Amino acid sequence: MQKKRLKILMLNPPFLPKFSRSSRSPAVTKGGTIYYPLWLAYTTGVLEKAGFETMLLDAPAESLSLQETAKKAAEFKPGMVVLDTSTASIYNDVKVAEEL
C-alpha cells in the first residue's frame, strides 16, 4: 500500500494591491515592484525534496482576492497551510488564515 503524502500549501496571502510583503520594508510599492516570497520558495523546495506535495501560491503577484485564494486552496486540499506574514499585514493575514 502506498503511503499518502501530506499536501502543504505555502501561501503569500492576498492584501493590498502591489503590497510587497517580502521586501526589506513591507509596504505598497510606488513602482509596482513585488518581490517574490523568497523564504516560502526556499522552504517549498526543501519540502518537495523531502517528499511532500506542495503548492506555492503567491496571491499578491497573481492579484488574487481572498475568495479566489480560498478557492485555489480548497481545490488543492492541503493538510497544512504555511502563511507568510508581516507586521504591516498581520490583521489581514490572521483573517486569511481564519477563512482557510
What positions do the PLM features span?
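A short, structured N-terminal alpha-helical element that caps or precedes a catalytic domain
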Residues: 1-100
